[in-house]
């Protein structure tokens, strides 16, 4: 996802309020744990993108930020919402550097849930874990991990160890944890 961002002033609440009123989202780009730049993201463009995104996929989405003539590859590390309207009011981006490891959550998608044997026998499919915490290089980031649940019967489970994890991803979450279960109703 490409975003054109602009520079902004720092630390004054009145300026942040004005940015939000004029259709912007205040944001910060971090690199190596330190603040790299204070920026403004177009709220309409980001909101439109966010509404088209699958649930949980934001954490593994790589953004190309066009900032002062250069392109910065980054992940969203934190997002703040307004309590009553659920409007995005602040973003934190983490710059991706090619040779540096990054920690992130990769969403887990259950595929073939409609054809699940346990569901056809009257069971209820419940996904317990929706994302796996991993460490990897930026080039190894995948949009999601898939778990085939077609053969899952009644009272059976699938663990993180059952997911085909691509080379380059090193799980932080213990692989013995249950991802999905089919229980009797």
UniProtKB/Swiss-Prot annotation:
Keywords: Ribonucleoprotein, Ribosomal protein, RNA-binding, rRNA-binding. It comes from the Bacteria. CDD domains: Ribosomal_L25_TL5_CTC. This is Large ribosomal subunit protein bL25. NCBIfam families: bL25_bact_ctc, PRK05618.1-4. Part of the 50S ribosomal subunit; part of the 5S rRNA/L5/L18/L25 subcomplex. Contacts the 5S rRNA. Binds to the 5S rRNA independently of L5 and L18. This is one of the proteins that binds to the 5S RNA in the ribosome where it forms part of the central protuberance. The lineage of its organism: Bacteria, Pseudomonadati, Chlamydiota, Chlamydiia, Chlamydiales. Pfam families: Ribosomal_L25p, Ribosomal_TL5_C. The keyword DNA damage does not apply.
